[in-house]
A protein has these predicted regions:
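Glycine-rich, aromatic-flanked loop segments that form ligand/cofactor-binding clefts
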Residues: 53-81, 104-128, 148, 156-172
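Second-shell residues forming the walls of enzyme active-site clefts
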Residues: 7, 35-53, 58, 150-160, ...
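Short, acidic/polar
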Residues: 10-24, 100-111, 197-202, 262-269
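Extended, intrinsically disordered, low-complexity segments
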Residues: 297-343
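Active-site mouth loops of central-metabolism enzymes
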Residues: 3-16, 83-103, 182-197, 255-261
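A substrate-binding/cap region within the structured catalytic cores of diverse enzymes
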Residues: 88-117, 124-140
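Glycine-rich anion/phosphate-binding loops
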Residues: 38-45, 90-110, 143-151, 193-196
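N-terminal hydrophobic targeting/anchoring segments and the immediately downstream early-domain regions
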Residues: 1-60, 64-77, 343
């Protein structure tokens, strides 16, 4: 089994150093960012290079949520509405919103599938909170847990019908965080009962998802010392036993400023706490080498979840529904008229 880490890479093509490193230390998968995406031909070539080294079925991840978070952006690729648009439609017409968001992510999946990308790090099922930091903002599907659960499920259905697996984030809920976890560690002082009725609810509704990504968040009333990604107590007691999430658990990006310690210590701490796979996004070669040297053995339970995840990704790709994308685009544009302006 490959090493339990997802790596980013530095640019539009692999360097000789990257090729050598990934061959010597094959990661479970890769994640792409804007710095890696210029044209369709270039992205396909980069992905083929990665798969030539690591294996043709290796997961290739991307954050293609719509709105502010689109690693594949116009004019080469389509513009997509921020997720909150579908929550607004849901307030007046639940079924219309559900169908439109499914269609939206079918179209996104089609673009990703054609490039060779097989995992989209979406949906965001954090709640929109008035006091929450704008890092979530319009990425959220709404403020009502049931709404977010229904629409999040439709996102996964849309992606899978297009041959791409989804990933729920940021478990167990980033919405109340008043600071950006890219910059510092958010502290959420809510009690368990309050969190269970709101933040945790969408994750409980989507506990069947194949994959989830942690939030780098401190919940002092659940674990006063460790952020979620490093908290054995929260991962075991809350994510696994209370939320009952059984899929593969990825850390959020280990290089984010919410976390402290060296990058290799962060990686070890995340896996020891119960994350199945670490995520390292920035392409910093020195950091990746430190992670590789620190890589521990994979626990049997993590091996089992990783195997299930890899099979799920392969099955979703193989069972893709063939749809008329032009017809879906017409349907989406018509349904979103007055809510989102396609440029």
């Amino acid at each position: 089994m490959k090493n339990p880490i997802i790596f980013g890479c530095q640019g539009l093509v692999l360097t000789a150093h990257e090729r050598s490193f990934f061959k010597e230390f094959p990661p479970l998968g890769f994640i792409l960012f804007k710095r890696n995406c210029s044209t369709k031909k270039q992205v396909i070539s980069l992905i083929n290079s990665l798969r030539d080294i690591v294996g043709e079925k290796v997961p290739i991840l991307i954050d293609q949520e719509g709105g502010r978070v689109q690693r594949l952006s116009p004019p080469i690729w389509n513009a997509y509405p921020p997720p909150e648009v579908f929550g607004l439609i849901f307030n007046s017409d639940k079924e219309k919103a559900r169908q439109l968001i499914k269609t939206n992510y079918q179209i996104i999946a089609s673009e990703l599938f054609d490039l060779g990308i097989n995992v989209n790090c979406a949906p965001v099922i954090d709640l929109s909170e008035k006091r929450g930091h704008s890092v979530i903002g319009d990425r959220a599907l709404g403020s009502d847990p049931k709404t977010v659960g229904v629409l999040g499920k439709a996102v996964i259905e849309g992606l899978e019908s297009g041959g791409v697996s989804g990933m729920i984030k940021h478990i167990p809920g980033h919405g109340r965080a008043e600071v950006d976890s890219h910059e510092s560690l958010p502290r959420i002082d809510s009690c368990l009962d309050d969190l269970l009725s709101r933040e945790f609810s969408p994750f409980i509704q989507l506990r069947f998802a194949a994959a989830a990504m942690t939030g780098h968040l401190l919940f002092p009333k659940l674990d006063p010392t460790h952020p979620v990604t490093f908290s054995r107590k929260i991962i075991n007691d809350i994510i696994r036993n209370l939320i009952k999430f059984e899929g593969i658990l990825l850390s959020d990006d280990l290089s984010m400023n919410a976390l402290s310690g060296s990058i290799d210590d962060r990686y070890i701490n995340a896996l020891e706490a119960g994350c199945d796979v670490g995520l390292h996004c920035n392409g910093n070669f020195q950091e990746m080498e430190l992670v590789a040297k620190a890589c521990p053995g994979i626990k049997n339970v993590a091996k089992s979840r990783i195997r299930v995840f890899l099979k799920k990704v392969a099955d979703v790709s193989e069972n893709r529904e063939i749809s008329d994308i032009n017809e879906l685009n017409v349907k989406l544009r018509k349904g979103l008229k007055g809510f989102f302006n396609f440029m």
